[in-house]
């Protein structure tokens, strides 16, 4: 018995010796912080000393929501003491920052180890190898600046969101043996006919070595958690990357109603020793355009959604916690969002939410606004760097369908168009598997039938993205919106056509939520009457904070009243209207149908969005919030435009509230069939 236990212990120790030695250690607590309103920190070399007059803060953090610092746009200093074990000397030690807005200098024990200039929203990494005192306490100092400078993107004050400075996202240390895997890129290719998927895996390592890779691929975010592949392979080295490929059978594709994911764990083996381990999620989907029409996994679809502007809650600003990010994602899904865009790069958690909950995203670099100068080499260089890092950081997210290179720039200026063209080409070079696009507000400046017609920069992308504000920012009769949209389509007939923004901005255009309702309804009616409109994005999910003047609020409360929720996530009446207009299924009637039965009349949406409703459930209840306590009726598949009649039990004397729920648990539509007898 002793020998049996002894050999079992030896096997266990051998097993643990082979487990990959990667630790991720959060470093978000007990940072010392001080603002530098006198701009003396650099000249007095604060980075060489322990900061004085500080307060303790936790990450993520921004000073612009603090009462005394709301209007400070300049330098802020952070410092943290970290004890580094002596046995880390031969390991790889990397400090990861989720984002620091907008420029930062990183010091270890008084010496500069990194800088990140003009890029306030991308995740970045600081290699600390050989720059630490091992077995001792080390001091990490971060000096960051959020002034309205010109050595950044967005340029100067050319942006419409808050200017919150600080270490606005979380930070962590990544510790592993060597060689170290710096990144993993998984490119899936779905073969619908064969129900199989090929994956190409590229691993970026800090050095080329004779290594083996142990691969495990598991179902993720699916009803089952099967291991679909477990294999050890020797990679091929191409351009400094370790490359491997596999073919998987019986694939469950990613779809916004069925966001099936796969998890890949790659262990780097050096001989018999596991030196590092890197993991990511990915998904198989085929998204393509055919003759201007959109297809997802072979299904003809149209898209509808809403955009959320991060930093909108004045209690958090850009320093949003995980719970706030997830809560905002849920609000998006509560209005049937399956399609969105972001004006600037978001926290990894946001894209993970979109992966798991089914939202297709256009992620953009924050190259924004008319004041961005054409032909500016500095701006273009920073934009290119941001684009590179954005693609590298978020390559594996199946929710990301497009890389966006700018919004509302001078879309007819030849120098600006040339820069946009180069950015789109770079996006396609970095990631040939996705679309690239530019969002325009100048498509209506002139059309194909104008003798002096010059194509807009939006034509350079894979599809047209048009910001449309007829009846508000556009000083035209609402009836003329039809003509404007038709003219744009006729000017670029070979391009799929999407509405990238529409909505009502207060206080510029007053009228409250009642006017917002009217604006939403008539714009949706216009888009849904156009067979060539492939999708639309409502702007915005919430009222959002901005540095722009023009509102009665001041400091951190300055805002655009633009949302179907307020800044804190409280719904307005327009929220339910957006949800109903964005539903893929319509409930049109509840009729008596024999003794004890009611008949529900349903149609698949022929507007926005359009897709097959598969796996949806129907409930009838007497209140809006208690439907899950009632019987669930499994609905048949409903195609766009298809009429479906469905019988349910009559529990409330011919009345009731019909709720239809998507496979992932979100309400698609909810309609009351209660009425007052005096109204009959």
Model segments located where?
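Bacterial Sec-dependent N-terminal signal peptides
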Residues: 1-22
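Accessory carbohydrate-binding/adhesion or oligomerization-edge regions at the termini
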Residues: 20-66, 139, 143, 147, ...
């Amino acid at each position: 018995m002793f020998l049996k236990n002894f050999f079992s212990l030896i096997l266990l120790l051998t097993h643990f010796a082979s487990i990959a030695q990667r630790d991720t250690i959060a470093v978000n607590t007990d940072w010392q912080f001080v603002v530098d309103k006198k701009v003396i920190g650099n000249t007095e070399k604060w980075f060489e000393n322990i900061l004085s007059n500080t307060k303790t803060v936790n990450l993520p953090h921004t000073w612009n929501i603090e009462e005394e610092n709301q209007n400070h746009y300049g330098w802020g200093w952070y410092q943290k003491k970290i004890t580094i074990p002596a046995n880390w000397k031969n390991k790889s030690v990397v400090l990861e920052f989720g984002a620091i807005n907008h420029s930062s200098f990183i010091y270890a024990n008084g010496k500069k180890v990194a800088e990140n200039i003009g890029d306030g929203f991308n995740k970045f990494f600081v290699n600390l190898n050989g720059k630490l005192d091992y077995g001792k306490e080390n001091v990490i100092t971060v000096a960051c600046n959020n002034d309205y400078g010109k050595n950044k993107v967005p340029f100067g004050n050319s942006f419409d969101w808050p200017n919150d400075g600080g270490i606005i996202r979380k930070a962590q240390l990544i510790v592993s043996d060597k060689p170290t895997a710096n990144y993993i890129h998984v490119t899936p290719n779905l073969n619908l006919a064969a129900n199989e998927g090929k994956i190409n895996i590229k691993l970026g390592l800090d050095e080329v070595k004779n290594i083996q890779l142990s691969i495990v691929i598991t179902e993720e975010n699916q009803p089952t958690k099967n291991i679909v592949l477990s294999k050890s392979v020797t990679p091929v080295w191409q351009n400094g990357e370790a490359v491997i490929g596999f073919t998987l059978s019986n694939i469950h594709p990613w779809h916004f109603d069925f966001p099936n994911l796969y998890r890949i764990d790659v262990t780097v083996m050096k001989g018999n020793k596991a030196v590092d381990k890197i993991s990511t999620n990915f998904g198989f989907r085929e998204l393509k355009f055919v003759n201007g029409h959109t297809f997802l996994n072979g299904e003809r679809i149209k898209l509808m959604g809403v955009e959320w502007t991060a930093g909108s809650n004045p209690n958090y600003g850009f320093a949003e916690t995980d719970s706030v990010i997830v809560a905002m994602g849920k609000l998006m899904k509560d209005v049937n969002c399956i399609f969105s865009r972001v004006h600037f790069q978001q926290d990894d958690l946001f894209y993970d939410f979109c992966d798991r909950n089914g939202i297709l995203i256009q992620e953009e670099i924050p190259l924004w606004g008319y004041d961005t100068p054409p032909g500016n080499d500095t701006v273009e260089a920073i934009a290119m760097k941001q684009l590179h890092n954005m693609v590298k950081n978020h390559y594996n997210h199946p929710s990301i369908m497009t890389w966006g290179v700018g919004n509302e720039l001078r879309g007819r200026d030849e120098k600006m168009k040339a820069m946009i063209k180069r950015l789109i080409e770079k996006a396609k070079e970095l990631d040939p598997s996705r679309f690239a696009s530019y969002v325009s507000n100048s498509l209506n400046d002139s059309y194909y039938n104008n003798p002096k017609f010059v194509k807009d920069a939006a034509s350079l992308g894979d599809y047209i993205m048009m910001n449309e504000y007829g009846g508000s920012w556009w000083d035209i009769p609402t009836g003329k919106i039809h003509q404007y949209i038709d003219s744009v389509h006729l000017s670029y007939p070979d391009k799929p056509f999407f509405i990238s923004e529409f909505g009502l901005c207060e206080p510029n255009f007053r009228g409250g939520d009642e006017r917002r309702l009217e604006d939403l309804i008539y714009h949706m009616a216009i888009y849904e009457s156009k067979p060539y409109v492939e999708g639309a994005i409502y702007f915005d999910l919430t009222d959002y904070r901005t540095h722009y003047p023009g509102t009665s609020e001041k400091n951190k409360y300055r805002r655009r009243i633009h949302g179907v929720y307020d800044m804190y996530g409280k719904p307005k009446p327009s929220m339910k209207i957006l949800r109903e207009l964005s539903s893929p299924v319509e409930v049109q009637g509840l009729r008596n149908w024999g003794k004890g039965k009611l008949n529900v009349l349903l149609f698949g949406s022929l507007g926005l969005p359009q897709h097959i409703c598969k796996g949806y459930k129907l409930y009838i209840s007497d209140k809006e919030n208690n439907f899950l306590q009632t019987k669930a009726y499994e609905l048949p598949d409903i195609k766009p435009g298809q009429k479906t009649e469905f019988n349910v039990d009559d529990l409330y004397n011919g009345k009731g509230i019909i709720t239809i729920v998507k496979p992932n648990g979100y309400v698609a539509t909810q309609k009351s069939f209660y009425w007052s007898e005096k109204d009959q």
